Swiss-Prot record:
Assigned keywords, A-Z: Chloroplast, Plastid, Ribonucleoprotein, Ribosomal protein, RNA-binding, rRNA-binding
Top-level taxon of the source organism: Eukaryota
Name the record gives this protein: Small ribosomal subunit protein uS4c
Location(s) in or outside the cell: Plastid, Chloroplast
Length: 194
């Protein structure tokens, strides 16, 4: 993980750690001139590692985004941001996306009153995300909310801290995406691969 954040910069979904500023300067001096391919590859890897996807999963999302109406890059980011594991992370119910994925896999999370154990579940507007009524589930979420830094919540999400309940208001707007990334380079990377 630390090699990844040193190479690609801060990835808030992967870990809470930040790269040191001095090490970044050394990497730039050592690496020399960066080719266009390398720039596109690094943007793709940044997206992959932030959301914790395999190459095949990301390729599937790129194909879905390509078939949808609108800008492929924007649609791709919307698809990734509306995943259940990412929404739990953005609500503060998990400190990282892998932590959110574990909560979902261990069946601690309910969507609209039903247990969902698929981290890639695509949330829709007006979905209500809650925890199971079990004490252990509530304790896990409570610890995560207490330990996570209280950043500004994106406008497409609402959280009730007392009932441990989150609400998806709408599909995310591109300015609220939690990662600094040039999504066009990712789309370009995949368009050149085929």
């Amino acid at each position: 993980r630390f090699k990844k954040i040193r190479r690609l910069g801060a990835l808030p979904g992967l870990t809470n750690k930040r790269p040191r500023s001095g090490s970044d300067l050394k990497n730039q001096l050592r690496s020399g001139k960066r080719s266009q391919y390398r720039i596109r590859l690094e943007e793709k890897q940044k997206l992959r590692f932030h959301y914790g996807l395999t190459e095949r999963q990301l390729l599937k999302y790129v194909h879905i985004a390509g078939k949808a109406k609108g800008s492929t890059g924007q649609v791709l980011l919307q698809l990734l941001e509306m995943r259940l594991d990412n929404i739990l992370f953005r609500l503060g119910m998990a400190s990282t996306i892998p932590g959110a994925r574990q909560l979902v896999n261990h069946r601690h999370i309910l969507v609209n009153g039903r247990i969902v154990d698929i981290p890639s579940y695509r949330c829709k507007p007006r979905d209500i995300i809650t925890t199971k009524d079990k004490q252990r589930s509530k304790a896990l979420i409570q610890n995560s909310i207490a330990s996570s830094p209280h950043e500004e919540l994106p406008n497409h999400l609402t959280i009730d801290l007392f009932q441990y309940k989150g609400l998806v208001n709408q599909i995310i707007d591109s300015k609220w995406i939690g990662l600094k990334i040039n999504e066009l380079l990712v789309v370009e990377y995949y368009s050149r691969q085929t």
